[in-house]
Amino acid sequence: MQVLVDADACPAVIKDMLFRAARRAEICVTLVANQFLRTPPSPFIKAVQVPAGFDVADARIVELVEAGDLVITADIPLAAAVLDKGAHALDPRGNWFSRENIEERLSTRAMMDQLRSAGIDTGGPAPFSARDGKAFASQLDRFLARHGKP
């Protein structure tokens, strides 16, 4: 089991939590981004830089992910692709993507895209909060307790 991170938009505090978890649980954490990422020295942490371009990092994550892996992303289409491969998907706010909720989330995303295309200001997500970080840490710990190294 490995953890893959859609790192371009992942909050720094979440990356730091993942770095600590990698060392503590001795699991591989791979950050994928289209920019250089500084990572702490560890045999369990690596960064993969992909060329700039629309969904290039997402495509690389889909290529690397295997059934049972965990992917950290807020990208709903990427989460859907990851679920299709039998992996798990968690957003940086501690919310799980699942077979039960992914279609609704894709539909909501499509509707919001249509509203924005029509010139309607739909706002954006709330700023990342300490509560979001705590929710993520809790879900990550639970996942690693169930699926981490034996």
UniProtKB/Swiss-Prot annotation:
Highest rank taxon of the organism: Bacteria
InterPro entries: UPF0178
One Pfam family of this chain: DUF188
Matching CDD domains: PIN_YqxD-like
Signal peptide: none
Disulphide-bridged cysteine pairs: none
NCBIfam families, alphabetized: PRK00124.1
Family: Belongs to the UPF0178 family.
UniProt name for this protein: UPF0178 protein Bcep18194_A4809
